[in-house]
Amino acid sequence: MIKEYKTLWSIPNNIGYFISSNEQGHSHDQYKYANFSFKVGDRENSVQSNINDLKNLCSINNIAFMNQMHTNKTRELIYYKNNTNTDGIFTRNKKIACAVLTADCIPLLVTDKLGSFIGCIHAGWRGLKSNIIENFFDNIRFSKLSDLRVLIG
């Protein structure tokens, strides 16, 4: 279901990331096997089972999924909150993982060389046109631009 690709991205040891596949999971038919979206018509219990499996594999209880709207909105998560209406989230809270779902959009994962935060961006053409990436970087000014590490999926 998930694969760890540490070699693709030079990041601090306190940061982990995973890229999921559709090879295993509880979803069926057109939703493949490991669907994590409640918005596409898959059975809710299948999606929740897939999310629970992901939490177990990653050993984390709080995975924050965005309610991706194809906008330029970004938000910092100080406390765990799921389904925030945004297309970019970041957190400095070590007990929260950030998740981005894509089909034909581009996922970006962001941290800095110290691993002081983790974030992700859902970049579709509407978000790119309305400066989602610029808005995200405007919200993480606590980290120097030269210290940032970005993985484009």
Cite the ranges covered by each PLM segment:
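Conserved nucleotide-ligand handling architecture
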Residues: M1-I19, E23-Q24, D29, N85
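A residue-level signal for beta-strand positions that form part of recognition/binding surfaces
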Residues: N14-Y17, Y33, I63, A97
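Intrinsically disordered, low-complexity, positively charged segments
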Residues: Y17-D53
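Hydrophobic/aromatic beta-strand patches that form the interior of the parallel beta-sheet core
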Residues: F18-S20, A64, G119, L151
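Short, glycine/acidic-enriched capping/hinge loops at junctions between secondary-structure elements
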Residues: D29-A34, E76-I78, N131
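A generic structural signal for short beta-strands and their flanking turns/coil linkers
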Residues: K32, N62, D104, S146-L148
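Phosphate-centric recognition/catalysis
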Residues: E44-I121
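Glycine- and Gly-Pro-enriched alpha-helical subdomains that act as flexible
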Residues: L109-G153
